[in-house]
Amino acid sequence: PKDLMLEVVRLLDKTENYTLLLFGAPNEIDALNFFSSAQKNTHNLAGKLTFAEELQLISSLDLMLSMDSGNAHLAANFGVETVTLWGVTHPYAGFAPFCQSMENALLSDRVRYPQIPTSVFGKTVPKGYEDCMRTIEPQLIVDRINMVLDIIQ
């Protein structure tokens, strides 16, 4: 959810320990400006890089935070530590980023949402599951990022 991801960005940005880079397509510029506009260390790169430039930058990251998306897989293939957020899908369905620790896969609450995974591809969202990602607390995400970065530095 947008409000919870904004809280993650704020928590990470205010430490001034990190530079946050937001990746996206040109049609996502406005959506990503929502996260970066009031933050000192957060930069919206949507629409500013060629694909080759984006790959080069991803390959040099210390960590990639991503939903279950293509960027998680790209980063993992470059050996970048990847923390992923999972809604109605589950990494055991076969879409976990390559060679990443399961501890870096932050899952929606499967007790509260026992039908997860609702489909292999996440296309099916049962009634009442629309907010399942709200069970992944912003502080949990920040704590995991801090733990991973502390381990690799």
What residue spans do the PLM features occupy?
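General structural signal for secondary-structure boundaries
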Residues: P1-K2, E137
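Donor-binding and catalytic core of enzymes assembling or modifying cell-surface/extracellular glycoconjugates
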Residues: K2-V88
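Nucleotide-sugar donor-binding patch of glycosyltransferase catalytic domains
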Residues: N44-L45, A76-I152
